[in-house]
């Protein structure tokens, strides 16, 4: 049994000291948790260094920490930052390991069954194994994760109990070690040495752990005793160092044995018989035959080889759980006294809540038509209330916390002062009558100063009309609409920063990647028209777009001041006065953020993909050259992944078939 090392401390490394009001935020949050607060909110204005504050809180509390964000891009950014802050501690990355994932689905309208299809990223799989092995063996662990952390991951007790511990001088025969390795899903391969494999040369066994990317362990025997353990470079065999003791963690998170499998098969058979009787009683003979045939095949595979495609749908039986019981997840691998940080909580909490319902709807159709047993519903993400039961202490981090977070706790800590001294922008309310002419005058002032302008409208038609009007006046302007893809959007933002145009018009300017230091004016048209984009939270976020420039200003065009406007204006003015007071006391002069303008990759490819997609139906693959086919495979793969993300299973399946056909043709030509 593995024992967790509890004596390691977090060591924060940074050339910066807490600045602005980071210090007071760190102290209040740390004191709050140490005094037993279960939930706290860090409400940090844009550009105040919330991640650095999070790192300081982690270091001071010295608890294993799970940081959750709502998309892979942000998870990657946070992972990189925390790796820099904590180079001597374990910082792990945990996201879905699928490069491509099309879930099993059935479309009753067209009687189309689509099998699960996926492609696993080996590097991410290795990082997931490193995460769980770190959590089992040490306390100084920070895991940065996506919402994948609330999906099933196997029983941590079985995982821990299956760890093979080896030490110098230990009495164990070579053959017993080989059997133990096979039991935890390691494969013997004396030629192709990869993660999750071992090889044998006489009295020497080399093991490549599942959680390592380039290190392996060489175990040397003398009779039935371990004589020496060394860590080696898995590629060159060069000795890195000697080890007195090592722990080999299972090569899978779903650990099983003969007893577990026998119990699971008996339970699956019982459920199958009940479901067959139910269908027959309802006169659904096709569904009854289908579920019996499919389940019997799966059971035969599991009995013979210990695995079947879609085995995760039987996880409730494998783990001995009751119907409706939550699955084991990454959260179960943490000790009880751990800390959760929810980054961008206004977006992450709704995502955590939505996972369960989306998963259930798809599986219910498979069950209703006899493709899966009802227990497949228990292979699922956690419900929100189940996630809440895992919470020991939690910190929600956002510039605009959502209603959920605000209802969880009264303990809110503000972080208002920016280390750069930048202020929240001035806000001015002007009448709607003559708003366009007034706006043109303000735009021209900014153009003279080589600054940029954001204009937000309420309707697509108004945005288009305003764009045309400004163009007729000779103003360089672009319209950012919802049909524009991510990469193209980034190119437009880059062109704005470079000065290729001066004004960007949009309906929703709250998406990622739209922070532009060169923007000194944000104009909000029809600010008094209540609705989603004119409610308090989006208004505050929109105002924040002018907070990265020392000349930042916001003009709201409105004939009356709504409650949402008043709340947003009051909050901004309060922060601005505090920031001005701080700057005056400390002799700080606000400076516009200097941010490098980076190239946007693959922009041309994105537009080429769009053209290829439109002409895909007209193509005859036989007429393409080998090179064209290879390029087409890449293009269709990207489209397939996009279709799967949108849950357009039929389109994804059609594209997959086309890809397989192309690959077959390319392979045949090679011969």
From Swiss-Prot:
Subcellular location: Cytoplasm
Domain of life: Bacteria
Residues annotated as domain Helicase ATP-binding: 31-414
UniProt binding sites for ATP: 44-51
Keyword match DNA repair: yes
GO CC terms: cytoplasm; excinuclease repair complex
ATP-binding in keyword set: yes
Domain Helicase C-terminal residues, every copy: 435-601
Task of the protein: The UvrABC repair system catalyzes the recognition and processing of DNA lesions. A damage recognition complex composed of 2 UvrA and 2 UvrB subunits scans DNA for abnormalities. Upon binding of the UvrA(2)B(2) complex to a putative damaged site, the DNA wraps around one UvrB monomer. DNA wrap is dependent on ATP binding by UvrB and probably causes local melting of the DNA helix, facilitating insertion of UvrB beta-hairpin between the DNA strands. Then UvrB probes one DNA strand for the presence of a lesion.
Swiss-Prot/TrEMBL domain comment: The beta-hairpin motif is involved in DNA binding.
NCBIfam families: PRK05298.1 (NF003673), uvrb (TIGR00631)
Name of this protein: UvrABC system protein B
Name of the coding gene: uvrB
């Amino acid at each position: 049994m593995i024992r967790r090392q509890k004596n390691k401390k977090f060591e924060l490394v940074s050339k910066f000291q807490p600045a602005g009001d980071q210090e007071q935020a760190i102290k209040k949050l740390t004191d709050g948790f140490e005094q037993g607060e279960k939930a706290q909110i860090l409400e940090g204005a844009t550009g105040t260094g919330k991640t650095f504050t999070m790192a300081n809180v982690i270091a001071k509390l010295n608890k294993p920490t799970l940081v959750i964000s709502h998309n892979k891009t942000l998870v990657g950014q946070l992972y990189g930052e925390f790796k820099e802050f904590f180079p001597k501690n374990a910082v792990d990355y945990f996201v879905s390991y699928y490069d491509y994932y099309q879930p099993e689905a059935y479309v009753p309208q067209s009687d189309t069954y689509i099998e699960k299809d996926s492609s696993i990223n080996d590097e991410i799989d290795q990082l997931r194994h490193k995460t769980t092995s770190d959590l089992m063996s040490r306390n100084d662990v920070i895991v940065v994760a996506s919402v994948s952390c609330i999906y099933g991951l196997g029983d941590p007790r079985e995982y821990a109990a299956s760890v093979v511990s080896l030490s110098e001088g230990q009495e164990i025969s070579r053959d017993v070690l080989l059997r133990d390795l096979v039991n935890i899903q390691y494969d013997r391969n004396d030629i192709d040495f990869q993660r999750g494999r071992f090889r044998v040369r006489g009295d020497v066994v080399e093991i490549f752990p599942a959680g390592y990317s380039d290190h392996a362990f060489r175990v040397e025997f003398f009779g039935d005793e371990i004589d020496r353990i060394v860590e080696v470079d898995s590629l060159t065999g060069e000795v890195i160092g000697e080890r007195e003791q090592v722990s080999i963690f299972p090569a899978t998170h779903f650990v099983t044995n003969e007893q577990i499998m026998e119990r699971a098969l008996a339970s699956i058979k019982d459920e199958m018989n009940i479901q067959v009787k139910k269908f027959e009683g309802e006169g659904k003979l096709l569904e009854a035959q289908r579920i019996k045939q499919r389940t019997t095949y799966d059971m035969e595979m599991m009995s013979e080889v210990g695995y079947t495609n879609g085995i995760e749908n039987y996880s409730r039986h494998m783990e001995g759980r009751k119907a409706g019981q939550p699955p084991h997840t990454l959260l179960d691998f943490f000790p009880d006294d751990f800390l959760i940080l929810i980054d961008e909580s206004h977006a992450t909490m709704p995502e955590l809540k939505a996972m369960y319902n989306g998963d259930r709807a798809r599986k219910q159709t498979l069950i209703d038509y006899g493709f899966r047993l009802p227990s497949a519903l228990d292979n699922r993400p956690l419900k929100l209330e189940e996630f809440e039961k895992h919470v020991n202490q939690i910190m929600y981090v956002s510039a605009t916390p959502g209603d959920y977070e605000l209802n969880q706790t009264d303990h809110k800590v503000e972080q208002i002062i920016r280390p750069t001294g930048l202020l929240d922008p001035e806000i001015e309310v002007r009448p709607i009558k003559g708003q366009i002419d007034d706006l043109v005058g303000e735009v021209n002032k900014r153009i003279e100063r080589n600054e940029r302008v954001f204009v937000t409208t309420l309707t697509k038609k108004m945005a288009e009309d305003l764009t045309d009007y400004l163009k007729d006046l000779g103003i360089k302007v672009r319209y950012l609409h919802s049909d524009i893809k991510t990469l193209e959007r980034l190119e437009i933002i880059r062109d704005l920063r470079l000065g290729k145009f001066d004004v960007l018009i949009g309906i929703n300017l709250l998406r990622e990647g739209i922070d532009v230091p060169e923007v000194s004016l944000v104009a909000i048209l029809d600010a008094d028209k209540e609705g989603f984009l004119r409610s308090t939270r989006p208004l505050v976020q929109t105002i924040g777009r002018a907070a990265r420039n020392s000349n930042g200003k916001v003009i709201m065009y409105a004939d009356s001041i709504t409650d949402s406007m008043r709340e947003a204006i009051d909050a901004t003015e309060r922060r601005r006065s505090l920031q001005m007071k701080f700057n005056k006391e400390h002799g700080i002069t606000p400076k516009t953020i200097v941010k490098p303008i980076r190239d946007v990759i693959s922009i041309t490819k994105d537009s080429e993909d769009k053209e290829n997609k439109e002409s895909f139906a007209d193509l005859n693959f036989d007429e393409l050259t080998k090179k064209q086919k290879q390029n087409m495979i890449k293009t269709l793969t990207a489209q397939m992944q996009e279709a799967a993300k949108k849950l357009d299973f039929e389109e994804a399946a059609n594209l997959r078939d086309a890809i397989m056909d192309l690959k077959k043709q390319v392979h045949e030509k090679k011969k």
